[in-house]
């Protein structure tokens, strides 16, 4: 990590939604004004999960959180720190002075109106602002962001995504819900019916949209992207098992992506996952869904 001075945004940033965006824009703005680096300080895992031992479903993996902060908001550095016993027992004062200032060279801090930090969450935005003033650091506390009268929050967005309401979730995220994972081998049934797919198994405790068929875009690591029809679920027509998969038919793509990482962006839910009477019926419906996907992206061009 660079020893250069930094303006640091504080938070967990799950989803990197519009509320987080207000923090990140202010962070980059202040960093440019000072001629220093912009950074995010965040935890690799939810503190609540570590404290309680109960897994917390997340909108994004740590890697996707970092990618979104950098790609959407031009953050220079993402400081991703394990939430361990040392961090759990660090007082809020030491968190500011020993970690943010001495270890990561903060000269200005940016936090949300409801941010809590330090042992037992005893640090508050008010304490952060007064402490920064005493230490000669800059500090901004960012108010809540609302859309349509609803406060933008990761909790609300998690609910929308889990219900499959990805189009509505996008209003609060400011970008499509994404999932990045390595392509795995499937049963190649799609190839036999002329609809080859790429298959992902979602990482543990990362939210995928509710079961159904979606208009999506698949992005490759070389920067190219393709409109897609993506099925989330257990593929009842061809599979008697219960394993959840994310299966995408990339339109106008011909290639082998096995073993490569791809990013799936979810734009709109088309329908429920359905058990069809035959593969021909399944094929015909997927092709109709592909027409819907082409029309959707053409309307956005």
Which positions does each model-derived feature cover?
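N-terminal catalytic cores of NTP/NDP-binding nucleotidyl/phosphoryl-transfer enzymes
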Residues: 2-61
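Residue-level signal for inorganic ion chemistry
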Residues: 17, 69, 109, 169, ...
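A structural preference for short, hydrophobic beta-strand core positions in alpha/beta folds
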Residues: 40, 80, 141-142
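Phosphate/ribose-recognition catalytic cores of enzymes acting on nucleotide-derived substrates
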Residues: 186-301
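N-terminal Rossmann-like or analogous alpha/beta NTP/dinucleotide-binding catalytic cores
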Residues: 47-135
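Glycine-rich, Lys/Arg-enriched anion-binding loops that position phosphate/diphosphate groups
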Residues: 132-234
């Amino acid at each position: 990590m660079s020893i250069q001075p930094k303006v640091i945004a504080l938070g967990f940033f799950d989803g990197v939604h519009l509320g987080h965006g207000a923090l990140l824009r202010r962070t980059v703005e202040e960093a440019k004004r000072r001629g220093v680096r912009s950074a995010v300080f965040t935890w690799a895992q939810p503190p609540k999960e570590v404290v309680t031992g109960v897994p917390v479903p997340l909108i994004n993996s740590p890697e996707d959180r970092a990618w979104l902060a950098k790609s959407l908001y031009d953050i220079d550095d993402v400081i991703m720190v394990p939430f361990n016993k040392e961090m759990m027992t660090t007082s809020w004062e030491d968190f500011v002075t020993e970690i943010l200032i001495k270890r990561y060279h903060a000269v200005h801090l940016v936090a949300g109106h409801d941010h809590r930090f330090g042992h037992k969450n005893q640090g508050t935005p008010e304490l952060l602002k007064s402490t920064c003033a005493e230490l000669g650091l800059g500090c901004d506390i960012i108010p809540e962001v609302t859309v349509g009268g609803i406060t933008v929050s990761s909790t609300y967005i998690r609910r929308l995504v889990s219900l499959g309401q990805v189009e509505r979730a996008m209003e609060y995220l400011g970008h499509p819900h994404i999932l990045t994972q390595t392509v795995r081998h499937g049963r190649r049934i799609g190839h036999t019916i002329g609809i080859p797919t790429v298959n992902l198994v979602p990482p543990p405790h990362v939210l995928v949209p509710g079961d159904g068929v979606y208009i999506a875009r698949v992005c490759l690591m070389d920067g190219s992207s393709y409109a897609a029809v993506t099925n989330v679920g257990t593929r009842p027509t061809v599979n008697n098992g219960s394993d959840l998969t994310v299966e995408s038919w990339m339109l106008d793509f011909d290639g082998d992506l096995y073993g490569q990482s791809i990013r799936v962006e979810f734009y709109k839910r088309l329908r429920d996952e359905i058990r069809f009477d035959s593969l021909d019926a399944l094929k015909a419906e997927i092709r109709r869904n592909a027409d819907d996907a082409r029309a959707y992206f053409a309307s956005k061009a």
